[in-house]
Amino acid sequence: MTQTNGRFLCVMVCAVLALAGCGHELKVTRVDAGVVTDLSGRWNDTDSRMVAEAMVKEALQYPWLGNFSQAKGRQPVVVVGTVVNNSHEHISVQTFITDLERELTNSQKVTFVAGKGERDEVRTERKEQAVYASEETQKAPGKEIGADYMMKGTIATILDEADGTKAVFYQVDLQMIDLENNTKVWYGQKKIKKVVEKKRTVF
């Protein structure tokens, strides 16, 4: 074998080894939905669920709930309004709203009614029933239950990053607003701070 051929063979072997080292093995592990999987440091399903649980629990412990029930002799009717994403991330706000709705409904302390999008769909169904459904099964309009309070709020972030380390600060603000007089009967705030470090691999 000539010296030139030997060098060529050596280069080819190194190239093959390098390509083999670039391969990625895909591994998928099925885990319980309740398990915390914080891979990127971004807002995730665990954050959404835990914040919704904590904030609804806090809201329902404040005096407005007891005061209303005592004055009216019934549970207050609550609807969830908009939650605005003011963060630097793409956050599934609808997932968070759904978590809030679940916690409010399952608390059995308030009567929960459908939000605007759902109401529009149901109203369309009633209109179609008036045309296509039999008279004895039609649902008449004008019998909806109006909400007494609306829960709405914002999600914001503050980002700090240096030398491969990133700190993300999430702040969720929610308010319970009396729909009759616009007074805010509860204001809650939940904060989450995450530190994400990028590990450098030395070959």
Question: How would you label these PLM feature ranges?
Answer:
Residues 18-42, 202-203:
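Bacterial Sec signal peptide processing site at the extreme N-terminus
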Residues 1-22:
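Sec-dependent bacterial lipoprotein signal peptides
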Residues 54-59, 77-83, 132-161:
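A short, hydrophobic beta-strand-centered structural micro-motif
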Residues 131, 198-203:
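Short, surface-exposed secondary-structure junctions/capping segments
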Residues 44-56:
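Phosphate/oxyanion-binding active-site loops and adjacent basic polyanion-contact surfaces
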